[in-house]
Swiss-Prot record:
One of its GO terms (cellular component) is cytosol. Pathway: Nitrogen metabolism; urea cycle; L-ornithine and urea from L-arginine: step 1/1. Residues 1-16 have a biased composition (Basic and acidic residues). Mn(2+) 2 binds at residues 124, 126, 232, 234. Optimum pH is 9.0. The enzyme activity is increased in the range of 20-50% upon the addition of Mn(2+) (1 mM), Co(2+) (1 mM), Ni(2+) (1 and 5 mM) and K(+) (5 mM). In contrast, the addition of Cu(2+), Zn(2+), Ca(2+), Mg(2+), Fe(2+) (both 1 and 5 mM), and Co(2+) (5 mM) strongly suppresses the arginase activity. SDS (1%) and EDTA (1 mM) are the most potent inhibitors. Reducing agents DTT (1 mM), PMSF (1 mM) and beta-mercaptoethanol (1 mM) also significantly inhibit activity by 85%, 64% and 35%, respectively. This is Arginase. It catalyses: L-arginine + H2O = urea + L-ornithine. Mn(2+) 1 binds at residues 101, 124, 128, 232. Cold-active L-arginase that catalyzes the hydrolysis of L-arginine to L-ornithine and urea, an essential reaction in the urea cycle for toxic ammonia removal and cell proliferation. Is not able to use D-arginine or L-canavanine as substrates. CDD domains: Arginase. Belongs to the arginase family.
């Protein structure tokens, strides 16, 4: 029988010596005004692919964990609270019919799983833990952001992605909910409980001025109108090229967190990175962030000491050769390490 990630985690921690070193403090951020001590990373593994059509993205969390992510986090001085990458498997398997609602595909499944994720994220956040959610497709952000904002109503959201993921049930062409989470979080037209009671658990928690995008380069026409109509701040790859990533991150923070007092939720879709950096993802778009640009975003946010929740989404180990998969998983691990305080010096 294949060893589960949870069992492997338990075995490693029972059998392995403490990996902490005297250099831990050099890699650790200063004290957070929001997180409890000792610093604990609450890991939420989400092996879920129901928000999009490509098989394999559900394997992302297990690949990250089996590659050594939990030890990476511990080596940075964090305590790890982890219940197993397959913790949501029961919620995902269902024989219940799930017909389309309008254009939306598998809406009941997505709703059930994302509500479960919201509860899990909130449980970690309410204990003062920094939640690290491993996807899985980006529809999961309906749950992760909802859970974070329930614990921190004054939080802000930094969304790093090639795509805006802000289609509504009326504007989506594909009907895939990984392209819609932000519209539900904002409570846009077509997302109300009166129109889609299956998602009545989602309470609009996000204000347009509390979200900023970095890395956009593939936006649907309907999304472009939504972004303009709601005056949502966006930094596309044009802005990254024009100003440089350092200035872009500074401007992004100035917009959503001008006084640097609000908790930050960072939702990072690896397709924000150029396909040469993260090839094994379902909706890759050329012309993305470089390796260093992606990592700088995480480093700069870690430097604020305001990060309370992190998503790493859309790693798909079924796409590409083994070397491409290993490269993408390794990038996912290093993004998490940088967001949790790893520095060179």
């Amino acid at each position: 029988m294949k060893e589960t990630a949870a069992a492997k985690f338990e075995r490693q921690h029972m059998d392995s010596p403490d990996l902490g070193t005297d250099d831990d403090d050099k890699m650790s951020p200063a004290t957070s005004p929001f997180l409890a001590t000792p610093r604990t990373a609450g890991i939420v593994g989400c092996p879920f692919s129901g928000g999009q059509p490509k098989a394999g993205v559900h394997s992302g969390p297990l690949q990250l964990i089996e590659s050594g992510l939990l030890n990476d986090i511990e080596n940075l001085g964090w305590t790890v609270d982890f219940a197993g990458a397959d913790a949501l498997a029961v919620s995902i398997v269902s024989d219940t019919p799930d017909p389309d609602i309008g254009r939306l595909k598998q809406p009941r499944l997505v709703s059930r799983v994302t509500k479960d994720v919201a509860d899990r994220v909130y449980a970690h956040a309410s204990k003062g833990q920094l939640t690290v959610t491993l996807g899985g497709d980006h529809s999961l952000a309906m749950g992760t952001v909802s859970g974070t904002f329930k614990a921190y109503p004054e939080a802000c959201l930094i969304w790093v992605d090639a795509h805006a993921d802000i289609n509504t049930p009326h504007t989506t062409e594909s009907g895939r909910l990984h392209g819609c989470p932000v519209s539900f979080l904002l409570g846009l037209d077509g997302t109300s409980s009166e129109e889609i009671p299956e998602f009545s658990w989602i309470k609009p928690c996000l204000k347009p001025e509390r979200i900023v995008y970095i890395g956009l380069r593939d936006i649907d026409a309907g999304e472009r109108k939504i972004l303009k109509d709601n005056n949502i701040k966006c930094f596309s790859m044009f802005h990254v090229d024009k100003y440089g990533i350092g200035k872009v991150v500074e401007m992004a923070l100035d917009h959503v967190n001008p006084d640097r007092t609000r908790p930050i939720h960072l939702s990072f879709d690896v397709d924000a990175l150029d396909p040469s950096v993260a090839p094994s993802t379902g909706t890759a778009v050329r012309g993305g962030l470089t390796f260093r640009e992606g990592h700088y975003i995480c480093e700069a946010i870690a430097e604020t000491n305001l990060l309370v929740s992190l998503d790493i989404m859309e790693i798909n180990p079924s796409l590409g050769a083994l070397a491409s998969v290993a490269q993408t998983v390794d990038v996912g691990r290093s993004l998490v390490r940088c967001a949790l305080g790893e520095t060179l010096l």
